Amino acid sequence: VCPAAITVATAIARRLAGFGGAALNFDYAIGEGGVGDSLQAVRRHGKHGVLQDPGLADLSAHVDFGAIARAAREAGAVVHGPMPQGELLERLGIQTRAEALKRRATPEQSADIAAAMERLLDLQQMGTLFKALAMTAPGLATPAGFL
């Protein structure tokens, strides 16, 4: 668990509970109960050695959305999720939006849209590796996609 992430989530949740509003978070994450070392490096969209080429690769680790959700609830916010990014985007109509974009796209743009959709939704890519978590003020409707 990252103490700074809990501090930030608590501050956001308190603000939402006190003043209203909503927050939507997407990140490379685990859900409830995940434990372990998830530090990794990514370079040019591929796995890379964590200590190889310092400064030239992006370092990341799974966010513990379960811990963030607990902290947000304790601070007074209503928590929705976490859920896989792909599932949320599907519920929000990403397929319909992509088809609308493709109707006015060049063949090259259409191929780019298809590739982006695969990356965002595929179960082996960002579709399940990334999670979505929403926090809302008490009394607000459940955010679209989280119903």
Whereabouts are the PLM-identified features?
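Long, Lys/Arg- and hydrophobic-enriched amphipathic alpha-helices
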Residues: 1-147
